[in-house]
């Protein structure tokens, strides 16, 4: 596997004809999440059960945060985000992660070649949206770019709604078409800001690898818990522990 700086995470594999690269590599995801012992998706992501996700939804951010903090997971919360629906709904689902950086011609050509070899079509944001499934939440590091950094607009938000049913996205960057998106009832988006410009001048550097959203770190398969402008990323292997802890009496604030 190849790391270039903090953001480029492309896996190298080997065949008789030589070296080649891939995004969203199962073996990499397995290495990143060894503490998860349960069911997994075909791509290797931890698959926390629907039942456990439903139980998490009953908890407050503070209940979850306390268990994370006690286990030294102190970089799991980000609050400097906007959200589409200003009501009491929660966004909870399994993370699909992606990261991007400003484009440059040689790197863009390399990434395009990788994507085409994997059958990916369209722009690099579409590569992620197209593959989302029920209950997924896209967690996207767009390097806080808002102007020309609009990861989704109305059409891709509709696609997220169709693919995930109850999911959404957390975007460390921009979105557009907020009037149209706000009318999609079964989706929730957290984002840095909105702008009417279309997305451009960006290139994918990782897909289902570790990403950063502000002060928080997310791995593929983490459970995303969003409420009122704040988002927690819950390691899959801690979900059972958090649910058990929530049933114990607590008599003081930390």
Protein language model features and the residues they cover:
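Phosphate- and other anionic-substrate recognition elements at nucleic-acid/protein interfaces
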Residues: 44
